[in-house]
Amino acid sequence: MSAKVWVLGDAVVDLLPESDGRLLPCPGGAPANVAVGIARLGGTSGFIGRVGDDPFGALMQRTLLTEGVDITYLKQDEWHRTSTVLVDLNDQGERSFTFMVRPSADLFLETTDLPCWRHGEWLHLCSIALSAEPSRTSAFTAMTAIRHAGGFVSFDPNIREDLWQDEHLLRLCLRQALQLADVVKLSEEEWRLISGKTQNDRDICALAKEYEIAMLLVTKGAEGVVVCYRGQVHHFAGMSVNCVDSTGAGDAFVAGLLTGLSSTGLSTDEREMRRIIDLAQRCGALAVTAKGAMTALPCRQELESEK
């Protein structure tokens, strides 16, 4: 039986442009996407965060509940609005984001909103939760507490630089998060920002060793992913698909990764690690073939039919 994966952060309504100029509201937000992705793959997930006492907040609560995510620790905030993001897609399906609500309800997460952690559980989060107080303190408290309880931390920076007014603070928060994380997924851009170096096997291993990261992954889009695990670097080629919308690819990848790791733990051998990365890659590849982030997340049946 797989361990529970708690996901902390923002539950967002993405506004996607339609061909007729209208905006289509879609449930999203990287943490919420990961929680739903895990549930669709047959894992056990719970969401920790805040939404506004507004129609978009109600939409996110209904969506997560319908998808089988535990929302016991998703709180309604009557004073702040649900995070809302305008997503713009270019001709290649690549996206840019405009945050319409600042500060949004998710950034007011308190330490009293956190659950009691259990041995073997996982916590996953992104850097948006670190971008403002009191969410920053709550996120670091959660990371520290779950490790003390014998659990594991997964961190995907998913950096949105326009949410950070102070680059020095961003770097400090990233370093602290890396020190607390067991598993870290970086994009190529995030790798360059954090390491300041070109990407090669030696530098990837050095960063993993510096922060004592058990599994460090650098995703390269269509080119695949590089994984440093137990001091060894492994290269996985990308999967060829027709990209319609890349919005949820990274979140689908993480959902597949954590679904696998929550079943095996971090003591898995190389063969099992390769199986988990294959699952994560197939999830990411399927997610780009449909429009939307959460709507495109694959379920277990889709993956089985692709074999």
Curated annotation (Swiss-Prot):
PROSITE patterns: PFKB_KINASES_1, PFKB_KINASES_2. Its EC number is 2.7.1.4. It catalyses: D-fructose + ATP = D-fructose 6-phosphate + ADP + H(+). Pfam families: PfkB. It is an enzyme of class 2 (transferase). Keywords: ATP-binding, Carbohydrate metabolism, Kinase, Nucleotide-binding, Transferase. Signal peptide: none annotated. Belongs to the carbohydrate kinase PfkB family. This is Fructokinase. The gene is cscK.
